[in-house]
From Swiss-Prot:
Glycans are attached at residues 101, 189, 248. The lineage of its organism: Viruses, Varidnaviria, Bamfordvirae, Nucleocytoviricota, Pokkesviricetes. Induction: Expressed in the early phase of the viral replicative cycle. This is Soluble TNF receptor II. The gene is OPG002. It comes from the Viruses. It comes from Camelpox virus (strain CMS).
Length: 349
């Protein structure tokens, strides 16, 4: 209905233009008015936006204007022989910011996550995906073309998304982004072992003597490496995560350890915490020993917020037996011992 009414108004305007008691005239100063054009040294009326000149003026008759048809337009006063065609429909990675009508061309701009590589007189002609900043990086700005600039998150900030829009966020309080587990066992005679397998919910280290299994639930930091080293019948092993994911404080990261002797006994007992420096970080642990092959066991679990000035930590430890020192550390030069890892593991300071 609106388009019909608009066409009718344009039609009337054309009648008014052509019906005015104005005939082409010779300008006294050689110049025509803004809404006129010059033809054969005569000033003639231009057609208004939304119309075109179906017939140009002559010495006795002014310009005849006709409304633009569907899919065509003129956006200014003109004496064009036909209306201009509107741009085609926007691509899938674009949004239409202005539709085609008889007075305006269609305008397409890039959708969120894209930027323009080919601009036209009416919007963007071609868009491509913006760079996505990886975990640990955030959007810090944009190039002159509109692509994303990624910068590492600084101290006190973090990013756990792959995104072309997210900036680095302030580090959340009372949580952690790193878990380091150290397990000391005595006596251990067999230095042979196999690479740890990852199933998504558990990690395990197996030798001919024993099997260490850690089941984890609702833990956002991702366990990525593990190690096993034997020196003077003391095995030092453990698991640790990357530092690019923070624990969601609405969940409790739960670690359940089972240290099982493969050939000596089947009795089971659960250890109690020997040291409890845990604060309000969201975590929970259990440790179960199965069998009689070990006389001493130490377990240290460190939950850390490594991206703060004060390096916030919670430390949990378990101890059984009287041979191992509760403050013992992993050997500082583990690469000379039997080791399962892709790189030298970290250890407590």
């Amino acid at each position: 209905m609106k388009s019909v009414l608009y066409s009718y108004i344009l039609f009337l305007s054309c009648i008014i233009i052509n019906g005015r008691d104005v005939t082409p005239y010779a300008p006294s100063n050689g110049k025509c008015k803004d809404n006129e054009y010059k033809r054969h040294n005569l000033c003639c009326l231009s057609c208004p936006p939304g119309t075109y000149a179906s017939r140009l003026c002559d010495s006795k008759t002014n310009t005849q204007c006709t409304p633009c048809g569907s899919g065509t337009f003129t956006s200014r006063n003109n004496h064009l022989p036909a209306c201009l065609s509107c741009n085609g429909r926007c691509d899938s990675n674009q949004v239409e910011t202005r539709s085609c009508n008889t007075t305006h061309n269609r305008i397409c701009e890039c959708s969120p996550g894209y930027y323009c590589i080919l601009k036209g007189s009416s919007g963007c002609k071609a868009c491509v995906s913006q760079t996505k900043c990886g975990i640990g990086y955030g959007v810090s700005g944009h190039t002159s073309a509109g692509d994303v600039i990624c910068s590492p998150c600084g101290l006190g900030t973090y990013s756990r998304t792959v995104s072309s829009a997210d900036k680095c966020e302030p580090v959340p309080s009372n949580t952690f982004n790193y878990i380091d587990v150290e397990i000391n066992l005595y006596p251990v005679n067999d230095t042979s072992c196999t690479r740890t397998t990852t199933t998504g919910i558990s990690e395990s280290i197996s030798t001919s003597e024993l099997t260490i299994t850690m089941n984890h639930k609702d833990c956002d930091p991702v366990f990525r490496e593990e190690y096993f080293s034997v020196l003077n019948k003391v095995a030092t092993s453990g698991f640790f995560t990357g530092e690019n994911r923070y624990q969601n404080i609405s969940k409790v990261c739960t670690l359940n350890f089972e240290i099982k002797c493969n050939n000596k006994g089947s009795s089971s007992k659960q250890l109690t915490k020997a040291k409890n420096d845990d604060g309000i970080m969201p975590h929970s642990e259990t440790v179960t020993l199965v069998g009689d092959c070990l006389s001493s066991v130490d377990i240290y679990i460190l939950y850390s917020n490594t991206n703060t000035q004060d390096y916030e930590t919670d430390t949990i430890s378990y101890h059984a037996g009287n041979v191992l020192d509760v403050d013992s550390h992993m050997p500082g030069s583990c690469d000379i011992h039997k080791l399962i890892t892709n790189s030298k593991p970290t250890h407590f300071l």
